[in-house]
């Protein structure tokens, strides 16, 4: 995890911030770089050497139609498996580079990242071996997120961990892609050619953590690739990394944290719980102290620093806030919580849920701000001492407002989630306005100006059921479009108090309308990838066509954890 103790310098002058801000905004006019394909390297224990690319190409021509051939597709034909072992590594550097934690003080060019990957892999493997021996680990989970944000994993015996780090872990592609809903059997897609193929889970070793709530087990978060070494274009984590790279190319870095609501029930209380609830009640926060202490302590040991927790507004509902971190770490923390909270709950014979059957939806707020690449200057902070965003902040906010309809499709991905947008209205509407304000928790986009470190935008469009990687990626994509746009806030001076909107933005209440908005949003389609948008829309349309209202709550209760 990154040490963000020195995120900002209080003595940075306003003039310096404005001058650097202008130069960074100018970078946004450049053509976006293409994301390069991952490269292959090889390892012999702790000694890492570059593999001959032609040899690797020949090794990758195994007949995948034969049973069992996929598991050994690139090394059975190698001359010496100990000296020439292929490793699939992503070429994305900086905040999302495999085996490289984000350091805002480092020049993260693609060439530098590639040259650093090999020695870092050796160093991390040595450290991980020591951790495994110290904790007497028996298993390591190789985890990846599917489109729903559900963790899909394979557990590997500890003695095979290094081999799987080098070779990768194979998993059917259908597990992570077009799943109509998490409870459907994957064999429904057996006739689709792409679902008969395997993908490769390649671990990002910086995410290796011992799981306190699992017996002698660790986990590592993985990036997903095809068997030929191509990034899986539907991978939410890959999409988030790609957007963070685009943000860095523009001269900025993302500091963010998720705020999650979740509900805890005893098994008999799952339906129609009568639990009394008072927001931030000390008595309710301490109602089951051992459970919350184990959860928070466990999250800390997995690298997710919890800033606070409290009771929330609904029966049995708790709120948990993470500390802000740079790069992909905030989404990794949220991904860890989604699985960890239920695993800890089961130890206490509880059920943890992000959405429950009574119809209200837990929120998944992304609190974020944009900093310079060095991580020392908050580009949203005006320094005026009043509730005001900089020009960069106004343009970023304008982008979120502009794309709010499409964003809501990704951030409230189920019918129940969309009910929260009109919970205070009794009128039947097709859409509601996208609201924003300063220090107003009722708004969809809440701007908080609490000093330099605390000047941020809370994106409250999100439901806790949404995939955190998609929430982060879509937020960055919309914000970047706002920075590039010459409309709205771009026409204002930095001293203006009001954010000009050419057209009022609306959030559709029906899932069908939200899907249409996403399909029509050319900016998000380009940023997130047409392949991903096509898969996501197809999945949601299938759900709508086969919707079982009575079962929806149970689906979320059991799987969206």
UniProtKB/Swiss-Prot annotation:
Classification of source organism: Eukaryota, Metazoa, Chordata, Craniata, Vertebrata
Biased composition (Polar residues): 50-63
Name of protein: Lengsin
Record-level Gene Ontology MF annotations: catalytic activity
One term under GO cellular component: cytoplasm
Organism: Rattus norvegicus
Residue ranges of the region described as Disordered: 1-78, 91-112
Residue ranges with Basic residues bias: 26-37
Domain of life the protein comes from: Eukaryota
Tissue spec. comment: Expressed in lens.
InterPro entries: Gln_synt_N, Gln_synt_N_sf, Gln_synth/guanido_kin_cat_dom, Gln_synth_cat_dom
Name of encoding gene: Lgsn
Boundaries of every GS catalytic domain copy: 236-561
Family per record: Belongs to the glutamine synthetase family.
Residue ranges that the Swiss-Prot or TrEMBL entry lists as coiled coil: none
UniProt subunit comment: Dodecamer. Interacts with BFSP2 and VIM.
Record-annotated GS beta-grasp domain positions: 135-229
Function noted in UniProt: May act as a component of the cytoskeleton or as a chaperone for the reorganization of intermediate filament proteins during terminal differentiation in the lens. Does not seem to have enzymatic activity.
């Amino acid at each position: 995890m990154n040490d963000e103790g020195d995120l900002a310098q209080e003595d940075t002058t306003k003039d310096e911030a404005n001058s650097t801000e202008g130069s960074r905004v100018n970078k946004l006019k450049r053509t976006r770089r293409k994301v390069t394909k991952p490269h292959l390297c090889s390892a012999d224990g702790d000694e890492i050497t570059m593999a001959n690319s032609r040899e690797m190409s020949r090794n990758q021509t195994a007949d995948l139609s034969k049973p069992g051939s996929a598991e050994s597709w690139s090394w059975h034909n190698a001359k010496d498996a100990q000296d020439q072992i292929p490793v699939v590594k992503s070429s994305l550097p900086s905040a999302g580079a495999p085996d490289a934690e984000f350091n805002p003080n480092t020049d993260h060019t693609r060439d530098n990242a590639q040259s650093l990957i090999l020695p870092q892999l050796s160093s991390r493997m040595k450290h991980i071996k020591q951790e495994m021996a110290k904790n007497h680990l028996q298993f390591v989970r190789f985890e990846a997120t599917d489109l729903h944000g559900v963790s899909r994993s394979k557990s590997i015996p500890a003695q095979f961990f290094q081999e799987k780090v080098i070779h990768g872990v194979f998993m059917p592609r259908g597990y992570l892609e077009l799943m109509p809903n998490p409870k459907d059997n994957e064999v429904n897609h057996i006739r689709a050619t792409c679902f008969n193929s395997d993908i490769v889970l390649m671990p990002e070793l910086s995410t290796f953590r011992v799981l306190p709530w699992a017996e002698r087990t660790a986990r590592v978060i993985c990036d997903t690739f095809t068997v030929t070494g191509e990034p899986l274009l539907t991978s939410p984590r890959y999409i988030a990394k790609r957007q963070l790279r685009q943000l860095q190319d523009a001269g900025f870095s993302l500091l963010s944290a998720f705020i999650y609501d979740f509900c805890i029930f005893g098994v008999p209380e799952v339906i129609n719980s009568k639990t009394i609830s008072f927001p931030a009640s000390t008595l309710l926060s301490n109602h089951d102290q051992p459970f919350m202490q184990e959860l928070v302590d466990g999250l800390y040991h997995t690298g997710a620093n919890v800033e606070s927790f409290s009771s929330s507004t609904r029966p049995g509902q708790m709120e948990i806030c993470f500390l802000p971190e740079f790069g992909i770490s905030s989404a990794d923390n949220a991904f860890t919580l989604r699985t960890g909270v239920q695993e800890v709950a089961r130890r206490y014979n509880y059920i943890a849920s992000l959405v429950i059957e009574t119809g209200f939806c837990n929120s998944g707020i992304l609190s974020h701000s944009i900093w310079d690449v060095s991580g020392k200057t908050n580009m949203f902070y005006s320094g005026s001492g009043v509730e005001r965003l900089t020009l960069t902040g106004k343009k970023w906010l304008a982008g979120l407002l502009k794309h709010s309809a499409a964003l809501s499709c990704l951030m409230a991905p189920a019918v129940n989630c969309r009910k929260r947008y009109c919970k205070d209205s009794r009128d039947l509407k097709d859409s509601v306005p996208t609201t924003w304000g300063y220090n107003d928790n009722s708004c969809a986009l809440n701007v908080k100006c609490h000093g330099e470190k605390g000047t941020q935008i809370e994106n409250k469009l999100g439901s806790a059921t949404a995939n955190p990687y998609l929430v982060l990626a879509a937020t960055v994509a919309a914000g970047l479009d706002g920075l590039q746009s010459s409309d709205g806030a771009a026409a204002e001076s930095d001293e203006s108090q009001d954010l000009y909107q050419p057209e009022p933005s609306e959030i559709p209440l029906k899932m069908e309308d939200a899907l249409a908005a996403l399909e029509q949003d050319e900016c998000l389609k380009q940023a997130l990838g047409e392949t991903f948008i096509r898969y996501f829309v197809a999945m949601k349309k299938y759900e709508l066509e086969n919707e079982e209202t009575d079962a929806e709550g149970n689906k979320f209760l059991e799987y969206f954890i």
